[in-house]
Swiss-Prot record:
Protein name: Mannose-specific lectin
Organs and tissues of expression: Expressed in the pseudobulb, with highest levels of expression in the non-swollen internode (at protein level).
Subcellular locations according to the entry: Secreted
Subunit structure: Homotetramer.
An annotated Gene Ontology molecular function: D-mannose binding
Signal peptide, first to last residue: 1-24
Amino acid sequence: MAFSISSTMIFLLSLALFSTLVSADNHLLPGERLNPGNFLKQDRYMLIMQEDCNLVLYNLNKPEWATKTANQGSRCFVTLQSDGNFVIYDEHEQEGRNEAIWASKTDGENGNYVIILQKDGNLVLYSKPIFATGTNRFGSTAVVVAKRNRKAHFGVEQNIIEVTTNL
């Protein structure tokens, strides 16, 4: 009995650690979302979906960029759609629908997209650069070509990111 309790505790602790690491990623792939309190993190930069429905990019504790959507909903999340649009939705669970309250307006063809919080603090939507917060420090102009079950390398030297995708 002691063995199964210990095994269960180790398993639960592993799950807790894994879920913590997942919420500290620096990127979102299509279909992934940040719920209230979830964030992307890269060094001293953090993009957080706040409880008040405002999506804010912080440099340490100083806000650098925001969607200015505070109090425009009650249960918001942000997601990267398969068409390349980065959208904040207010979730109306009882009505079975979501209402868009902000979008990057980068929708196009379905494809391979990734949104990355770079090492320089710039939040960039890649397939080719089509949306950025304008907070870049090193002038990156990378292009991503993500393929099924492959690694993608992108970013200028100061911002090199490697993401393994299962698109």
